């Protein structure tokens, strides 16, 4: 489902210019992590519906239909049960697509409304799709579409998007001391710095590094994202039925062996 510019204009007013900035890390466990401590979750119905989708597809394959060109030439036709099952599968595909489109439209609009400068990583999506462990998750959350909507909405409202180089190791750099942890794996959900002892959520750490790169690029004095701003944003997300969580302040701490 595509959102036209006219539809966008009706529901989203031009935002007031400010110097507030944010680093955004796109993840698998959480859809995105923001440098203000908020983490956005993908819609829960998608997980359930995707499992149901697999079940429907298996049921469809068992119904009578021509499975090869040779069978088609032999006159094997689709049974009524196959046609009915196919219609149900298409309906489910549409439902999943609509939920995903609604989520991405609302989320990208809220980010553009709250921030004037946005730091994002330049993901090598094609390369990541080659990893079978990541491919399904990347397909479900539609990173490409999220990036596309952020780009065109930022351009329309004259906000600035800064793309950090795709080879910048945002997840491996300690946001406190700058040490690089080369042995960090996808299984490591908590970043523990071997140099200064910082213990912090992995994705939150990456978002802080992206924010740091953004600030170096724009070179402006930034206004602070206050607790009141954070509360207002959480409320805005809640009324739009977007699930969030806040990074535990206790997890961002230095510890020493």
List each language-model region with its residue ranges.
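Positively charged, low-complexity nucleic-acid-binding target-recognition regions
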Residues: 137, 141-257
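Substrate-contacting helices/loops that form the catalytic groove of nucleic-acid
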Residues: 1-147, 220-257
């Amino acid at each position: 489902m595509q959102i036209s510019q006219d539809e966008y204009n009706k529901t989203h007013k031009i935002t007031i210019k400010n110097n507030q900035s944010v680093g955004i890390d796109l993840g698998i466990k959480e859809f995105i992590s923001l440098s203000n401590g908020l983490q956005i979750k993908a819609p829960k119905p998608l997980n359930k519906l995707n499992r149901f989708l697999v079940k429907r597809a298996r049921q469809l394959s068992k119904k009578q239909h021509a499975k090869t060109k040779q069978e088609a030439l032999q006159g094997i036709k689709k049974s009524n049960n196959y046609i009915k099952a196919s219609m149900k599968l298409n309906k489910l595909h549409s439902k999943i697509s609509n939920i995903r489109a609604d989520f991405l439209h609302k989320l990208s609009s809220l980010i553009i409304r709250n921030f004037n400068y946005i730091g994002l990583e330049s993901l090598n999506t094609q390369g990541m799709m080659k990893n079978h462990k990541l491919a399904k998750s990347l397909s479900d959350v539609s990173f490409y579409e999220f990036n596309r909507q952020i780009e065109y909405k930022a351009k329309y409202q004259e906000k600035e998007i800064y793309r950090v180089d795709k080879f910048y190791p945002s997840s491996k750099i300690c946001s406190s001391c700058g040490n690089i942890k080369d042995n960090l794996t996808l299984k490591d959900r908590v970043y523990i710095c071997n140099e200064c002892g910082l213990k912090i959520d992995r994705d939150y750490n990456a978002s802080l590094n992206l924010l740091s790169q953004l600030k170096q690029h724009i070179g402006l004095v930034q206004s602070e994202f206050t607790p009141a701003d954070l509360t207002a944003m959480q409320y805005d997300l809640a009324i739009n039925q977007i699930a969030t969580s806040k990074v535990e302040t206790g997890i961002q701490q230095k510890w020493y062996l």
